[in-house]
Each structure stands twice: as structure tokens, then as C-alpha cells.
């Protein structure tokens, strides 16, 4: 018997790469997956005269593109930079926004020029309101088949812009799941002859950018919490605002302008139900009188590295 293993990793520019190994035997656990390597000189990660880079498996997923096969998430430098004691008590919910584009780089629905102003597209239905739903639905189904806890999808504020949400427990696990969900999204788009754009402001002008709002909580935030606990966390986030912005994605200044449901990149703010704040306090938290809940960090850009996000949040608040 043989097992098809598809190894997934990040190159020097944090772009996803993959290669396939047909391995002997019925492989079903991480310990059985062989360490492999690739040509790092072709990914800007090694010189040509010393080009072998090791692929170290860290998590397995059922491969939704091939029956009885596995996707292998491999270790990265930023994943290994998470050195605090990781815990399933750290909960993360990423809201990944993105545009689906055609071969020329234009968002779907923009082929004949700029559409009407934003307003009818958010959670819209109908051929004039959305574009690319087949990609979105296929991606959702394949994430479920890969045992990724995708919790929802919706059309976003601009035509051709979408969002999906992924929930995970543990800082490293959350990063693994988000990266693999991105990999599956790009593979699905490939099958539909489309591309995925996760730049934070791909469409200039009066259009929303793309973010990756990050919902997070710890055991103490969910169990017998208090307003004081939440105030302390918010104060720590404010004190470390610059450190967060530094790892919250490239070109995020183009998105965090204080317009289009964002706060200014230069100023930290928070508020109950405020989508124009750096950190939104959700209604569930407020309605519990701050005894249980979570916070939504609205600063991360759509292209941010989730390992960076989980690390800086936990480093800040613990």
C-alpha cells in the first residue's frame, strides 16, 4: 500500500508552496510522515551551492482534493518563534477577507469596469450583487473535509470580495489551520481558473480594504472574568500598539486610515460594538457584564502571518 502526502510550506516571501511524495505504507500519524527537503535556491531560502532545506511535518490534514491522501503542514521559522507554553485555553477566530480575481488581476465582477458603489454587495445574493460564490462554496466544503473548523462565509462589502472564518484552539494550531485554509483556497481557485488576492487594499478609492479581524480569548476571559480583567488587557494592547502594527501585515497603512470600518494606524482605540475601533468589544462580552467573552482585534491585515498574530497577542496579554 502507498500513501500520497502533499507537503505544504512557506517560501521566503510567505507564499505557499507544495510538493507531493508517494510514500510506502499506510501512513496515518504525524510520527510516520518522513522528513523531506526541497530546493531552497528556487524559493529564495538558500544559496545554490547549499540549497537543500528540510521540510519538518507539524500537522496532518485529510487531503480534500485526493481520496485517502494527506496534506502535511510543515514547520516555519515564525511558527517556531512561538516559545511560550502553548495551550488549548488560547482560542482564536480568524476572519480572513480576500478578493477573487481573474487572469488579468481584476476582481470578479469588474471585467467591464468599476461596478456601482459599495452597499448592495455585503451578504448580497443575485448575479448583480456577488461574483465567485462557486469558489467560496467549494472552499468551505473542502475545509470541512480537511477537518479545519471553518465556521462561516459571507460576501463582503466590495464586489468580488469574500470572507471566511476559522476557529482554533492553541496559538500554533491556529496558525497551522489558517495557513492550510489559505492553501486550500488557492487550490480551489486554481481549479476554477481564478486567483486569490489577500492584499489589504487592492482596490484604491472608496472601497473597503481586506483585513483579518482576530477574535481571541483566554481561560480567564471566559471563566469568572470581570470588567477589570478586560480593562487590563485593553490597556496592555494600547501600550503595545506599535509592536502589533509591526507584524499585522504589509501595506496595512493603506487600509487602516480611519475610514471604511477601520481605525487609524497611528492611534489605538476600543469600544463596545465599534467597528471603527482598533479593538471591538463584542455584544456577547458586554451583555455578560464582562464575566465571559472575547475581544476582536480589527487591526490585522488580510495578508498578516497568523503565527505573528497569535504570538504578539499572547505575549502582550499574558
Residue ranges of model-derived segments:
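Glycine-rich, acidic/polar active-site loops that bind/position phosphate-bearing ligands
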Residues: 1-318
Amino acid at each position: 500500500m502507498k500513501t500520497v502526502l502533499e507537503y505544504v510550506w512557506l517560501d521566503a516571501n510567505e507564499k505557499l508552496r507544495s510538493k507531493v511524495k508517494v510514500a510506502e505504507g499506510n501512513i496515518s500519524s504525524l510520527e510516520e510522515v518522513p522528513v523531506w527537503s526541497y530546493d531552497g535556491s528556487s524559493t529564495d531560502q538558500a544559496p545554490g551551492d547549499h540549497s537543500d532545506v528540510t521540510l519538518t511535518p507539524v500537522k496532518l490534514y485529510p487531503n480534500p482534493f485526493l481520496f485517502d491522501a494527506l496534506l502535511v503542514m510543515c514547520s516555519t521559522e515564525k511558527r517556531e518563534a512561538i516559545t511560550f507554553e502553548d495551550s488549548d485555553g488560547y482560542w482564536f477566530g480568524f476572519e480572513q477577507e480576500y478578493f477573487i480575481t481573474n487572469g488579468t488581476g481584476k476582481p470578479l465582477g469588474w471585467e467591464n469596469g468599476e461596478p456601482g458603489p459599495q452597499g448592495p454587495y455585503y451578504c448580497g445574493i443575485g448575479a448583480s450583487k456577488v461574483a465567485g460564490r462557486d469558489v467560496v462554496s467549494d472552499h468551505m466544503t473542502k475545509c470541512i473535509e480537511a477537518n479545519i473548523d471553518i465556521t462561516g462565509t459571507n460576501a463582503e462589502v466590495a464586489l468580488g470580495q469574500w470572507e471566511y472564518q476559522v476557529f482554533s484552539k492553541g496559538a500554533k494550531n491556529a496558525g497551522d489551520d489558517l495557513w492550510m485554509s489559505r492553501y486550500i483556497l488557492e487550490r480551489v481557485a486554481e481549479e476554477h481558473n481564478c486567483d486569490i488576492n489577500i492584499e489589504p487594499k487592492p482596490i484604491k478609492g472608496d472601497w473597503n480594504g481586506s483585513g483579518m479581524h482576530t477574535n481571541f480569548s483566554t481561560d480567564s476571559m471566559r471563566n469568572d472574568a470581570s470588567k477589570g480583567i478586560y480593562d487590563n488587557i485593553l490597556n496592555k494592547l494600547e501600550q503595545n500598539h506599535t509592536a502589533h502594527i509591526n507584524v499585522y501585515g504589509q501595506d496595512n497603512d493603506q487600509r487602516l486610515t480611519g475610514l471604511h470600518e477601520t481605525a487609524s494606524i497611528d492611534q489605538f482605540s476600543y469600544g463596545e460594538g465599534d467597528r471603527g475601533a482598533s479593538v471591538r468589544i463584542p455584544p456577547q462580552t458586554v451583555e455578560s457584564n464582562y464575566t465571559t467573552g472575547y475581544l476582536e482585534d480589527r487591526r490585522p491585515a488580510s495578508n498578516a502571518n497568523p503565527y505573528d498574530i497569535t504570538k504578539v497577542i499572547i505575549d502582550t496579554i499574558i
